[in-house]
Amino acid sequence: MPALRFPSRLTEGRLVRRYKRFLADVELADGRLVTAHCANPGAMLGLAAPGRPVLLSAATSPGRKLAWSWEMVEADLPGGPQWVGINTMRPNHLVAEAFREGRLPALAGVTSLRPEVRYGRASRVDFLAEHPAGPIHVEVKNCHMMRDAGLAEFPDCIAARSARHMEELAAVVRGGGRAMVIVVVQMRAGRFTVAGDVDPAFAASFRRAQEAGVATVAYRCRLDPDEVAIEAEIPMLPA
């Protein structure tokens, strides 16, 4: 499967603390203390404990305020420790790369992807996929929570914005259009489900979207310090 290679090998460190949601202090292997951007608005349950091994990417833009981004954490998950991708900006790039290489079955027949297209009630869809049978509104979700061995779950907190997206995708289908949700699981998992106990409203919206005809698919990733790769489709359990 296609891989998203980092410009340089990720840098090892240990998490000191995550704070203000989008910031993390990390002690690097050489003893330096740096502040990294945490591109994740979620609760990150079990992933933000101080002392956990983490991997950071170095900023490629010299004018960026923070020189580091937090990419992965080695978490003690059910079934054993493993690296988990926490950067919610990566899945869209992974999907786009998979499409370019023609190796993502969910997008078979798609001729082009347009990112960040406006639709619905002042929303933006992650991609508008052009297809001979008609355009497909594609929403991408990042998944990084595991509470039972092998079972990936989304969301890890109240996800009102994501619930609204589900309702708007359902409206697209009811209006004669096509829509799809691609869940990118940034860890080793064998199955995916919606965490209805975490956000019952999102779970209900997800079910309504499926019932309306929104296609849903989940892919797990392989992660290492050099790259992240979509590896395989995994079964999606009922929401």
Swiss-Prot record:
Gene, per the UniProt record: sfsA
Domain of life the protein comes from: Bacteria
Single annotated GO MF: DNA binding
Taxonomic lineage from the root: Bacteria, Pseudomonadati, Pseudomonadota, Alphaproteobacteria, Hyphomicrobiales
Gene3D superfamilies documented for this protein: 2.40.50.580, 3.40.1350.60
Matches recorded under InterPro entries: SfsA (IPR005224), SfsA_C (IPR040452), SfsA_N (IPR041465)
Cited NCBIfam families: sfsA (TIGR00230)
Record family assignment: Belongs to the SfsA family.
Name of protein: Sugar fermentation stimulation protein homolog
Matches recorded under Pfam families: SfsA, SfsA_N
Species this protein is from: Methylobacterium sp. (strain 4-46)
